[in-house]
Amino acid sequence: RSDLQRACYAEPLLRRFPGCLVGNYGTNPHDGFRYWYDYFETEQTSYPGLQEGRALYRHWANEFETTGYTFAMPVLYTWSRMWRWYDFEDPDYRWFRPMLLEGSSCARNTPPGLPIVAFVHWHTTVPPTPPDPAMKQFTVEGYQEFLWHMLLRGVSAFYLWCPAPEYAEEVKALYPVWAAAQEYGEFLSKGRPVAFDVPERPGTVISGLRLKNRVLVRRTDFGSAAGEVVLTVSGQELRVPVAKGRCQVLELK
């Protein structure tokens, strides 16, 4: 499949348009696992992978390396099946954890300089039929926090997919984050990610981009805030206080 994508898609485009960006849905560097299932796939206990509660994170081939693609394109959707994988009381974290696992897997393993353009979607993707009254939509606030963490873990841009009836609400959820992020353009274009941890249970999530001795940080607390958190970045301390709903630029000491 990788050879086919290179020979029939990437190479012809790059010959005609040298230096162009070429990529494809769901094809990206990763940590050896895939943390989501597409709409046409079924979950089987026989799949080789990593079991976590009701979630089975499948082993996934390194198909990106030989495609010749010039950007990575992870899929960060609110797939409805994710909801039942976990028993977290905080409904937002049922979406946040698997999406952050997938996004962080790509960001951590993508070489510096290779853009990451992430497919995103806020509305519940492929909702169950009949509807599950217990399933809670990812809140706009939770989704926007997720987008911030993706930017501060190295995502270069977002590619919004949605059915036509969802256009207005999807753009209203995504655009404010993208617009606000432009204030930190130098960090986004030149900074290097400092954190990729994804808590197993609802707690404190921290992401950041380092530029010299400064770090642009986003901290999101699921549950009660735990006070100041200390990270070690290249042997230096980074103290991250609670800052609900906003970014911070902190100095390494």
Model-found features: residue ranges?
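Glycan-processing catalytic domains of CAZymes
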Residues: 1-253
